[in-house]
Every structure is written in C-alpha cells, then in structure tokens.
Amino acid sequence: MQTLHDTSFASFEEKKSTFLAYLCPIKEFDMLHQQLKTEHPKAAHIVWAKRCLNEYRQIVENNSDDGEPKGTSGPPVLNVMRGFELVDVGILIVRYFGGIKLGTGGLVRAYGSSAKEVIAQANIIPFVFKETVRFSTLY
C-alpha cells in the first residue's frame, strides 16, 4: 500500500474541457473540497474519490460523480486509486465544460487520465501502519 504527505496538482485537457486534479492526504480532504467549491464556483463538476483505513485496518472507499452520468467519473478515479494501492488519500477533480460533450466513454477516459496524471506528479511513499503505545516503568 502507498500514501503521500503533501497535496499534488495536475491539469488535463480533453476536447476543450479542463480537468484540474488534486491528490491530498485524507486529513486535508474535506477542507480542500470546501476550498475548491469556493475557488471554482463556475466549475461544471467537482468529482471525488477517497480511500482510507478504518480502525480495523479495513479499506473504506467512497466516491461522487457530482452530477456527471452515473459511474462515469467517481468510479474510474477510484479504480485508478485501487490500481496504485493508495490509502488514506483523496482525489478531487474540478471540471470546466468546454462546450463539446465527451460521451460516457470519453468521461471515463478523461477522469481516469486526470487521476493517473495527478498521481504521477505526487510524491508517493510506502504506507506504514502506526500505533500509539503508552508504557511506564519504575526506575
């Protein structure tokens, strides 16, 4: 499994639509999502996917198409994250519509390519399980 420390960014263009992709640690995900909504009020969509480990070391996944046709944006991004075995991270992709419809296949390819591009730009590191342990001794 892999993760990252810092947020990374990449942009991708497909048939005049612009895709702005952000990969961030899960701790920053909600704050970044709100920030992007504020910074990009005219964006057509803000699609996201995230993967994290729960307290039982199970991978919990979620995604949103944010108004794109069902299954054409969030799931492809999530599948890319699975392929790279990323955990405790989220990807947000802001889309500005360029006037040319991409179709369902085009959307799947564009969102998947955006996710791959932002991962390629990121400083990916191995994921290490960490636990806090307290102990005391007499001396």
Which role fits each region the language model picked out?
Residues 17, 43, 85-87, 129:
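Short flexible coil/turn linkers enriched for glycine and charged/polar residues
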Residues 110, 114-122:
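Stable alpha-helical structural segments in soluble proteins, enriched in small hydrophobic residues
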